[in-house]
């Protein structure tokens, strides 16, 4: 009888343990142990490498985490986050469940959902990081990514919001610029060849398609749910109609598209385009400061709202340096790192921190940032249009390639 009771007790304990939320290993609740394990580790940070200012910022982060924590951070520069996701998928298929080649990944949206659904992410760690106490948890996008709960499997890094900009020396004042996608279509017809967008699946190009879709469909709330193939064609018909109408008056008559945002930015600098856009409110000022765009460039948004979200870092389940990756993720949430990141002299990426959670000195430092001549104030940025469920972007990119891809 005693043996039977012991067995039942053991079974109950196992069931109880299974019912508890998964805890990351190492456990960020024991932060001194995480830092001790991280010292001496090398973290391979897979992140987009298409911006010199972002690359410089990541180099600064690497210097800081090496100096403070003994962690070596190597930036693996990507053109497309899906490349890193594919690596982890291949490693899991090959049974490489430890010592993976990707330790930390800059991610959000459909790539995050894909990794979460396939069990490719480390257990929830983000909300246990010491610097989580500074995060603006009143912003739902720091815990929900494209309508999908993050479950602590990715740590917020920065904010993003679509902003348009133009060279006012050629286009005239931004007050005369289009104020929604219908007006943009009319403007493009009046200025043939002076507008374009990066070809999906480039992130900025795909984001533009979402902006158009949200504005053009009758019921944007449909986009909060996963794609239903039964009504995909009907729901997205207004998007394809808009794209068909604008294509003949795009740059190169829509026969070619900029490869990515840097290529589109260069076309503005070369006076081949008059209006472009980015997913960072400070991008225009940063480009002016870097000498990449003339100082006559100014930003504008659509009064009805533009697309916005949060971007994150996540740790693959088979990372060879999970402790080191946690230390880097935690440093990225520090007031020091977030302050430098928001400064357009370095990057200009909006913070994910709550000003109320910071010390008076840190709040003053954020308030003192010179945001540059082309950066709109928070009050001028207008409403945020929430991201659709990630499954919509996957299907829209596929359909765009069929219709307009080379």
Can you annotate each of these PLM segments?
Residues 26-30, 266, 373-406:
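Conserved C-terminal helix/tail region of periplasmic/extracytoplasmic solute-binding proteins
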Residues 112-114, 276-294:
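A ligand-binding cleft/hinge motif common to bilobed small-molecule-binding domains
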Residues 30-39, 46, 51-72, 164:
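Short, polar/charged alpha-helical segment
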Residues 9-18:
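Bacterial N-terminal signal peptides
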Residues 48-60, 76-83, 98, 102-262:
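Extracytoplasmic ligand-binding site segments that recognize negatively charged/polar headgroups
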Residues 1-9:
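Bacterial N-terminal signal peptides that target proteins for export
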Residues 160, 242-246, 257, 281, ...:
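Periplasmic-binding protein-like
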Residues 306-307, 311-380:
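Mature extracytoplasmic/periplasmic domains
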